Amino acid sequence: MSTDTATEAGAAPAQSTTAMTVTVKILRYNPEVSEESHWESYQVSAEPTDRVLDALHKVKWDLDGSLTFRRSCAHGVCGSDAMRINGKNRLACKTLIKDVNPSKPITVEPIKGLPVLKDLVVDMEPFFDAYRSVMPFLVTNGNAPTRERLQSQEDR
């Protein structure tokens, strides 16, 4: 019987046998409270196939609503949830709990090189300023083409 069918029949859904308690250690920063950042640890229940983003949601929704982080598509497309997880730049929505050694605290901090606004949120404007300055696209000198511009091996 599926979990949905069991729930509809009045039975409790089956409990996962792989759930574990993981410690998420987050570098917190709130300029309205202090100029210094500090580490805070939270314990959440997680499955090995949960994503770090799921753990952050549990912290925010169940333990500390003041935690601030960006997320959007949750499918690894937009890059909104880029952060340092266990010392590496990663997307929280693509990083599985089982891949970051959940037997030890999972450290989460903002990405480096950009000013931190609050907790895991950084000011992206310096990045976008640099992006606009290099114009990472082709600019034509004439009229728009009427068909696709094909590139030969010699043109590359």
What do the predicted segments below correspond to?
Residues S2-R156:
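Signature of N-terminal electron-transfer/Fe-S-associated modules in redox systems
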